[in-house]
Amino acid sequence: MASFFSDFGLMWYLEELNKKEFMKFKEFLKQEILQLRLKQISWTEVKKASREDLANLLLKHYEEKKAWDMTFKIFQKMNRKDLMERAGREIAGHSKLYQAHLKKKLTHDYARKFNIKVQDFSKQKFTQDDYDRFENFLISKVTAKKPHMVFLQGAAGIGKSLMLTKLMLAWSEGMVFQNKFSYIFYFCCQDVKKMKRASLAELISKEWPKTSAPIEDILSQPEKLLFVIDNLEVMECDMSERESELCDTCTEKQPVRILLSSLLRRKMLPKSSFLISATPETFEKMEGRVECTNVKIVTGFNESNIKMYFRSLFQDKTKTQEIFSLVKENQQLFTVCQVPVLCWMVATCLKKEIEKGRDLVSVCRRTTSLYTTHIFNLFIPQSAQYPSKESQAQLQSLCSLAAEGMWTDTFVFGEEALRRNGIMDSDIPTLLDVRILEKSKKSEKSYIFLHPSIQEVCAAIFYLLKSHMDHPSQDVKSIEALIFTFLKKVKVQWIFFGSFIFGLLHESEQKKLEAFFGHQLSQEIKRQLYQCLETISGNEELQEQVDGMKLFYCLFEMDDEAFLAQAMNCMEQINFVAKDYSDVIVAAHCLQHCSTLKKLSLSTQNVLSEGQEHSYTEKLLMCWHHMCSVLISSKDIYILQVKNTNLNETASLVLYSHLMYPSCTLKALVVNNVTFLCDNRLFFELIQNQCLQHLDLNLTFLSHGDVKLLCDVLSQEECNIEKLMVAACNLSPDDCKVFASVLISSKMLKHLNLSSNNLDKGISSLSKALCHPDCVLKNLVLVNCSLSEQCWDYLSEVLRRNKTLNHLDISSNDLKDEGLKVLCGALSLPDSVLKSLSVRYCLITTSGCQDLAEVLRKNQNLRNLQVSNNKIEDAGVKLLCDAIKHPNCHLENIGLEACALTGACCEDLASAFTHCKTLWGINLQENALDHSGLIVLFEALKQQQCTLHVLGLRITDFDKETQELLMAEEEKNPHLSILSSV
């Protein structure tokens, strides 16, 4: 409510009260101060005070918002609703003032700030359809009524910022969201990132028309606020901060990364709405960490838009069709043309090549070829064959600038950065003139590349010309670091960087580079790239981190069959997601050259589902056939994972035929969230393969009929499946009866995971089967199965009678202390065989630890106990530690993460460490352990009789002094590992 009184005056409202009302106001004020236990004002002063004096007294003794809140309450008690309504209208005046300011600002800045280079082609007037589309942005796809968190997803330069500007302009003109939002604030992440630290109040104030924004007024109705956050990818954040790092105070300065994370993860202003623009890569990185209510895809130019633009440039209809067809044949190039400014680049590049009488086929060979042709054309006059020395120097400096920007996440460059990389003030007009650089929309003295992909290709050219050691900035790393960073998707804004490096190694690109710069290039880079791939080949962990699609695009751009075969045979494991037609083409091109693969994980999302254009269908299926052929060509492949995929009938049959091939000997088949639009019996025929030992169907919908088909196969003698995962498959209690028959008949099934299915009443059927003497199951996982009180008696009976069950996980069920007591009665029996019990998130308290302690003292088989995420507190841990010290306890691992522990329990833990001869691992993350408590723990860990090897603590949860202690103790103790994930 800041500035409200200065703008409108409390005295003015008090003047509206007559003498009798004014005295009544004072009486009510006295009561309010007493009720709220506020600092007292002298009643003598209040009684004597004039209206002006009383207003000043209130403002002197209380914060403005508190004074206003009391005034509002008193007006309500006095039944002066007219004054309340008038105040409401006056406050709304802030909104109208801001709305008018935003309209003026957007109208004034529109052409400069959000200009698209093909504006003559893409100019549109607002229509009712536009307004309807904007309103539809905030129609939630989730059923629960929640504040909006909408992502606008699309490639860089495709028109997201323009769309957001149009939306804000429509709001400022009173056409949309008038009753929904009082304020819409626009934050450009390029500006936010420069601030380093800021509060939300500061960001809002920067957008306000006056020097002081009425922050309290604005934030008083958070549900009436819409924050538009543009270019989120610039922040390079993945929203992975711990909850404790987030902030809920709008006036507190924070690192801007934390501030945005606090907003988007709803720690701050949870009732407000957000509209966020981001690239697909950024959205993918944050998915699951930010709960979005809707995702809108911005696709840019469609086929008819691209064709129309080509026609406007080439005039000749026949020539236009010829050129358009050539571009369309290269799906990667055609995808580039969906971005308006890049469509202009492609078209003008081809036009220049025609004017020079050159062959367009070679230019359109690969995306790299088109980009380099365009860039070199910019620096070679139409009449000349070669560039001038000045042009060579300008491009070389530009490439140096681009490389620095890629490593420092800089896409807007000041004059200092230009000079540091050799670009003089006199060069700038030329670079602007040829349209490789343009003035930043934010500042007259800063510059950006025409599109981020042009910066990427220039940065790639730098590495062909010079070593990173020759660069003026130490931030620029080696070619090896570049390739690993690109393949591991460490930097989400590196879309083409690595693939351009590979593309520039093609013979024709080498010739172009040598012709332009006038000297021969070193062939050392090609050897370095192959060494990178060999390093990946020898490192299983690195192979898991490599994004297969990034690798495929690198090899595709290089267009070297021999190198491709060599590179693909370095890979034993590949994980990739093909999101569109272009991805499928590139993946197929590479996979058909692979013969050493052992593990393959793939997703084609909706690319191979129904509804594809007829012209694409045949090509798509051919590509899918090539992708599946790796199941035959790689003789040692033993794991296939297909996830998040919809396959039409033909695509399903192609996969089926390859999996049924005699030489395909998969041991593990993982099918997660997959829809096969074909006869499901075909799929269940696949799992009859006698080599198959592990079947994971998690997240894949299974009807009751599917469950019957599955269990028929599992019950067959020839079936060798030992591990079955059917979590979140929409199973019902009735399905438990079918699985129960398998538990009795199958001699192979050892592991069954039924998590995240509503099984409550079905547990009785499962339990009867588990008690059967023919049941050989060893591991049963029932996490989040909506188990009720009656289930614990059934499972207790299983624990008493089953002699093969080693592991039971019933986490995330309402077990509570009462249910735990029932299970512990069975686990405390001397003949209990269970070795591992997990009861995380089960609402267990200190009281439940008494029963667990009894189990630890009596059960000599229990080796692993997971009690994390239960509020057992220090008293509960004391009970467990006393039991762990008992000679009958042979526990090896215990999980106590997020159990509301403090440093006070460390003495008990230390005592357990030194007395228990079997304990080797403990997880203590997300507890309030202090420095002094940890010193006690480490003293115990130094003792010779202590056998603990793994300590679960997240070092970054502690202050600097404690972090140093943890690192020093880990270094001193060669047997100890402190891990953040246990």
From Swiss-Prot:
The keyword Nucleotide-binding applies. One of its GO terms (molecular function) is ATP binding. SUPFAM superfamilies: DEATH domain (SSF47986), P-loop containing nucleoside triphosphate hydrolases (SSF52540), RNI-like (SSF52047). Residues 148-471 form the NACHT domain. LRR repeats lie at residues 594-617, 689-716, 746-773, 802-825, 827-844, 859-882, 916-940. ATP binds at residues 154-161. This is NACHT, LRR and PYD domains-containing protein 4C. It comes from Mus musculus (Mouse). The lineage of its organism: Eukaryota, Metazoa, Chordata, Craniata, Vertebrata.
